Amino acid sequence: MSKYITFRVKILTTGQVVEWLAKDSIDAREGVADFYEVDYKQTKLI
């Protein structure tokens, strides 16, 4: 069974903070970037 963790990711272009379930921090940032159609570099863990 995979363990998922809730990460808080900020989208730098909009200032929006999103909670995202993922296996690790990279997966969380990639998921938010893909879902909100922004570049990975425009996301930051908080």
Where are these regions (language model features)?
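Short aromatic-glycine-(Arg/Gly/Cys) micro-motifs in beta-strand/loop hairpins
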Residues: M1-Q16
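Basic/aromatic-rich interaction segments and small domains that mediate binding to polyanionic partners
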Residues: T6-R8, R29, A33-Y36
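Well-ordered beta-strand positions in beta-sheet-rich domains
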Residues: V17-L21
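Short, mixed-charge low-complexity intrinsically disordered segments
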Residues: D34-I46
